[in-house]
């Protein structure tokens, strides 16, 4: 791991974290805060973008280390958030909203798998 790669990860991470904050705030404002729609939205978006980045960076550009560090590890790593998803699912289930918590878990896993698959398929089709 070189210093330039760490800089790429840090830069991408900073942009991803700010993007996540803004998207979650906007979605929560629009959809309401009773259900974690904001986290679901960034995880779906991030999964789709990770699929597109995988095809472009890894398959087409043969794994350009700088772009992989900047986009896939830094930006998309900070944009998506498994730890927040886990806490929100736990919180829903602890507050007697077991069905909502389970629905959130199922939606997150299934829809994010679909999103990454769609990103890969769409990018392969375009490129």
UniProtKB/Swiss-Prot annotation:
InterPro entries membership: FluC
Topology of this chain in the membrane:
Multi-pass membrane protein
Can you cite an annotated GO cellular component?
plasma membrane
| GO BP term (any one) | cellular detoxification of fluoride
Residue sites binding Na(+) per the record:
77, 80
GO MF annotations for this entry?
fluoride channel activity; metal ion binding
Chain ranges passing through the membrane: 7-27, 38-58, 70-90, 102-122
Q: Which reaction is the catalytic activity of this chain?
A: fluoride(in) = fluoride(out)
Alphabetically sorted, this entry's keywords are: Cell inner membrane, Cell membrane, Ion channel, Ion transport, Membrane, Metal-binding, Sodium, Transmembrane, Transmembrane helix, Transport
Q: Is Ion transport one of the keywords UniProt gives this record?
A: yes
- The organism's superkingdom is given as Bacteria
| Broad class of where this protein is predominantly found | membrane
Localization (cell): Cell inner membrane
Regarding activators and inhibitors, the annotation says: Na(+) is not transported, but it plays an essential structural role and its presence is essential for fluoride channel function.
What does the record give as the function of this protein? Fluoride-specific ion channel. Important for reducing fluoride concentration in the cell, thus reducing its toxicity.
Q: Which family does it belong to?
A: Belongs to the fluoride channel Fluc/FEX (TC 1.A.43) family.
| Name this polypeptide is given | Fluoride-specific ion channel FluC
- Native species: Hahella chejuensis (strain KCTC 2396)
């Amino acid at each position: 791991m070189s210093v330039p790669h760490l800089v790429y990860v840090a830069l991408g991470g900073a942009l991803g974290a700010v993007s996540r904050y803004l998207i979650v705030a906007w979605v929560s404002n629009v959809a309401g805060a009773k259900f974690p729609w904001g986290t679901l939205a960034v995880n779906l978006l991030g999964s789709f973008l990770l699929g597109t980045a995988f095809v472009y960076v890894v398959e087409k550009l043969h794994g350009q280390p700088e772009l992989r560090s900047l986009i896939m590890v830094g930006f998309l790593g900070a944009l998506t958030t498994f730890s927040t998803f886990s806490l929100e699912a736990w919180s829903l289930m602890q507050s007697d909203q077991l069905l909502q918590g389970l629905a959130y878990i199922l939606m997150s896993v299934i829809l994010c798998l679909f999103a990454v698959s769609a990103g890969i398929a769409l990018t392969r089709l375009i490129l």
